[in-house]
Design a protein with these regions (language model features):
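Structural detector of well-ordered beta-strand residues that form the stable sheet scaffold
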Residues: 52, 77, 98, 151-152, ...
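PLP-dependent aminotransferase class I/II
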Residues: 36-41, 45-49, 112, 116, ...
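N-terminal "arm"/small-domain region of PLP-dependent enzymes with the aminotransferase-like
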Residues: 1-28, 349
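Phosphate-binding glycine-rich loop
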Residues: 28-75, 88-93, 99-101, 166
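Histidine-centered beta-alpha loop that forms part of the nucleotide-sugar donor binding/catalytic region
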Residues: 81, 95, 102, 156-157, ...
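PLP-dependent aminotransferase-like
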Residues: 66-155, 162
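Conserved active-site segment immediately N-terminal to the catalytic lysine
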Residues: 153-187, 216-221, 269
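Active-site PLP attachment segment
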Residues: 170-209, 231
């Protein structure tokens, strides 16, 4: 069997048709009509009034943080176990990420740790939903109300997911999405900020476009970046969005298959299928090695690659990132659950283009490897 990538998107809908329309009409830049349509449809799908498309998910977080007025010296509470984009969006403006550990069962941030981390400098909490299951959001919203904090919801991996029946992306002051190729819907690269606040939405649009002064071209009233999103990207995104329900269904079927086949393998801890508030949509199919196994996720990655199977290790913790350690940040901080996830967690091929034959091969080789390790 040829090499099985960890992710491959499904691009056999209207993507080519809409892209050809862009090329035929000449609308390929950020001014094209597909951009506004994509913004409208994503915001509607996420239960929001306004959508602002940007270059990628990292840009979406940066715009969200800046739009909320978070600045130097402010503190933002977030999980240590996440992608570095979350922390970078905060440190870029001179603010300070304040970290919490992970819930070992859901792999999301431990909500019970948040209140103890709130100080007079705390300005916001960043909710980060990971690997297909949402964070227990109600408790965070209650804390935000109690302490008058802003809430940023990173829903990058949550296209089509709900929390207690409400769409992920609909919570807090502002939410963000990513459209990287490993997401349920992709635009190649891309992201979006969604909100119900008209002033915040206008602020995000301003930040997206180099902060051009209103109605005066090439005059700028503050420093920003070019975070614009093209009509070509939006064309792909619209075609993808048309099939979101189908994609979520396929991901859940994939997750159930893997769980049924791997649940009795000694040494493996599999993702939770459902909680009281959500059913897993398996952004990726993550697996955790038992603590008794001496090997780490990098060993598994190497062994799977030898069998022609792509895989990825879990995120590395923010408090252990060299870039922050060099700056003296998070000195002496430890988060045992997150550290365990980062060292023992990995995910196997789970892209939308994955075939049944490929899944069966992956299962066979995972069983073989675990027999060798345990």
């Amino acid at each position: 069997m040829t090499f099985i990538p960890v992710n491959e998107p499904l691009l056999n809908g209207n993507e080519k048709k809409y892209l050809c329309e862009c090329i035929d009409t000449g609308w390929i830049s950020s001014e094209g009509p597909f951009v506004k349509e994509f913004e409208q449809k994503v915001s509607e799908a996420s239960g929001r009034k306004y959508g602002i498309a940007v270059a990628n998910g990292t840009a979406a977080l940066e715009v969200a943080v800046q739009a909320l007025g978070i600045r130097e010296g402010d503190e933002v509470i977030m999980p240590t176990f996440t992608i570095i984009s979350c922390a970078m969006a905060v440190t870029k403006v001179g603010a300070v990420p304040v970290l919490v550990d992970s819930d070992i069962h859901t792999w999301n941030m431990d909500v019970d740790e948040i209140e103890a981390k709130i100080t007079p400098k705390t300005k916001a909490v960043m909710i980060v939903h990971l690997y297909g299951l949402p964070v227990e959001t109600d408790n965070i919203l209650a804390l935000a109300k109690k302490y008058d904090l802003k809430v940023i919801e990173d829903a990058a991996e949550m296209h089509g997911q709900t929390y207690n029946g409400k769409p992920c992306g609909s919570f807090g002051d502002i939410s963000t999405f990513s459209f990287y190729p490993n997401k349920h819907i992709t635009t190649g690269e891309g992201g979006m900020v969604v909100t119900d606040n008209e002033e915040l939405a206008e602020r995000c649009r301003h930040l997206r476009n180099l902060c051009f002064k209103k109605d005066v071209r090439y005059v700028h009233d503050e420093i920003s970046d070019n975070y614009r999103f093209t009509n070509l990207q939006a064309a792909v995104g619209l075609a993808q969005l048309e099939r979101l329900d189908e994609f979520v269904k396929k991901k859940r079927e994939m997750g159930r298959y893997y769980s049924n086949e791997l649940r009795n393998i000694k040494g493996l801890i599999l993702p939770i299928e459902r909680t009281d508030y959500a059913e897993n949509i398996y952004w990726v199919y993550g697996i955790l090695l038992d603590r008794d196994i001496k090997s780490d996720n990098k060993t598994l990655q190497k062994l799977l690659a030898e069998e022609g199977i792509g895989s990825r290790t879990f995120f590395w913790c923010m408090h252990e990132q060299p870039v922050y350690q060099k700056q003296g940040m998070f000195a002496g901080e430890t988060y045992p659950n997150a550290e365990y996830l980062a060292r023992k967690g990995f995910y196997i091929p789970s892209g939308l283009a994955l075939t049944q034959e490929q899944m069966e091969y992956v299962v066979c080789k995972v069983k073989k490897i675990m027999t060798q390790l345990y």
